[in-house]
Amino acid sequence: MTDFQFSKVEDAIEAIRQGKIILVTDDEDRENEGDFICAAEFATPENINFMATYGKGLICTPISTEIAKKLNFHPMVAVNQDNHETAFTVSVDHIDTGTGISAFERSITAMKIVDDNAKATDFRRPGHMFPLIAKDGGVLVRNGHTEATVDLARLAGLKHAGLCCEIMADDGTMMTMPDLQKFAVEHNMPFITIQQLQEYRRKHDSLVKQISVVKMPTKYGEFMAHSFVEVISGKEHVALVKGDLTDGEQVLARIHSECLTGDAFGSQRCDCGQQFAAAMTQIEQEGRGVILYLRQEGRGIGLINKLRAYELQDKGMDTVEANVALGFKEDEREYYIGAQMFQQLGVKSIRLLTNNPAKIEGLKEQGLNIVAREPIIVEPNKNDIDYLKVKQIKMGHMFNF
């Protein structure tokens, strides 16, 4: 179905809020499966029967960590060997059920799981409903249907639990594209991807909070250092602010990814330290601006992996080839945290100091208004010239040498 368009996440959330079933698919390089999803508060016999009839997979009940703790739903096994670490608990039936297997009795069990008065002793173990514990942080931590189910219920303003069921084709294999698309159209069912849900959360959830603000005299001039912490990961970042940002318009700004070797050691294997110095100098001269110092060492792969990549580069690989050889993308960085930091600082539009087109696109995707790109001009040296040429040729960086 070449003309097929996925639903808007907002429409999927509204359908969940109304008690409807939606269809959600994950990445092609993961399970590459579609699941039916609905909220546990609407685990009606009709919804369960639909899942059993058309999905034919295992009907599970994704729940938050809080619900699992409240009801003493413990992991099914001590050592999880599932390919995707799906967090099954011991299966359960509510004590008011008989065999527990009918759509009506599975409905009772699922709805009792989200009953405010429910307690651990209300459930028999084992049973016919299979709770799955979602990771804290949801699809931003694990891109699974378990997390998607709980995230969608939360975004719909409902209890943090739901139902999910894999969809099999008539021949018993897992239904994939384009058959999933055809099914969604035939049943007028909202259909989204987990990637869409991730992007929605990055744009709409508050994922970073400001902790402190202090004066920061530097060799470039006096700045104000604003500390931030990511809500999910606890990762810490800093914004160095110069001048008055009250109107928030056309602020000279840079996102600088942490580079211990370049920023602190003065390494000549990269131009990071030079770029940081140039940006600080330009903002000081301007009298107004922001540098976000993000903890994204080694284009997001971390310090040790960056040094491992250097080892591979010493053996003949370039910076892109080395990252890929270690199992990473050429650039693992994302900029939604930076965009939220700018927003919390009151920045509305920026003149971005960068040579990297991915930063421009990453910030634009988060709704930040970039009115101009200001180049960072540094002189290459004999140790980083090949590295810079690779970034120019393979990653599209905009250099003038």
Curated annotation (Swiss-Prot):
Sequence segments annotated as region (DHBP synthase): 1-203
Q: Which residues bind GTP?
A: R254, I255, H256, S257, E258, Q275, E297, G298, R299, T319, T354, K359
- Give the enzyme's EC designation: 4.1.99.12, 3.5.4.25
Which amino acid positions bind Mg(2+) 2, per UniProt?
A: E31, H145
State a single Gene Ontology molecular function: manganese ion binding
- What does UniProt give as GO cellular component? cytosol
In UniProt terms, what function does this protein have? Catalyzes the conversion of D-ribulose 5-phosphate to formate and 3,4-dihydroxy-2-butanone 4-phosphate.
What is the protein's given name? Riboflavin biosynthesis protein RibBA
**Species, as recorded:** Actinobacillus pleuropneumoniae serotype 7 (strain AP76)
